[in-house]
């Protein structure tokens, strides 16, 4: 049971590139989750998903990666987008996309997952239901969909051509991935899972201190409304209810879970989530925390040295567990 922490050191040219990205983000609109913004964003996301699929699928195919769409059984079938590598897969990765529980899709994660497929991993990405106050879809729906996807993946690992499974998620997907790992352990299905990767995950829906104190200068998010935005995920719960382990994995029993890798930017108001969760995980299992200085939430999407370094670190960590 160990926590190993590493701070990334950027050379001056890399640091300058990181700061240029931050300067651009400082001029960009902040993410907010009022109802009309969610509806508009989800309509745009559907269009982007279709457009991205027309671009990424042929690109993946040129590198020998094939795309398969399957659907789970049950009352609410869940679409799974599977990236099959060119050869026999080294392992399967269950990928849960980010997007604040309101945006994103499995298809839009092709760009983030391509490096894993090119590296020989079979990636199963989950199209879970997104939050919609208008349709009364909340966090419990997303959790249920991810569990259904996990059970399908565990059951079909042999069909996918591998004997080892990893679970990965970024941002909101990190939150859902952690809850999924706990659920698999509770069902006695965790032995197949050799590790979890959480990239700037959210682990406390009541809001850690760094979330509560986020100001208007926060990059990507609208800092002053972050705590309220989290509360919208489960409107039937008060603050104590948001701290319950069925929705906030920071407060869950973490014993019996596999090793985990945490990556987080130190300019992210959710950085404290990763720090606290990695500390707790390391008390129960093995955990590695990679701290990336001067980068905000979502840095995998922005390119540059932070994103390249994170992708390499993830591949290296996964390789060490095969």
Predicted regions and their residues:
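Catalytic nucleophile-loop/oxyanion-hole region of alpha/beta-hydrolase
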Residues: 105-106, 112, 119, 124-164, ...
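Proline/glycine-enriched tight loop/beta-turn segments at coil->beta junctions
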Residues: 75-78, 84-92, 121, 255-257
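Hydrolase active-site cap/lid region
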Residues: 182, 186-240
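Short beta-strand element of the alpha/beta-hydrolase
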Residues: 90-100
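Catalytic active-site module of serine/aspartate enzymes centered on a nucleophile-bearing elbow/loop
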Residues: 303-322
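Gly/Ala-rich beta-loop-alpha elbow adjacent to hydrolase catalytic centers
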Residues: 169, 173, 177
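Short beta-strand/loop motif that positions the catalytic acidic residue
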Residues: 262-264
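A glycine/proline-hinged amphipathic helix-loop "lid/cap" segment
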Residues: 1-82
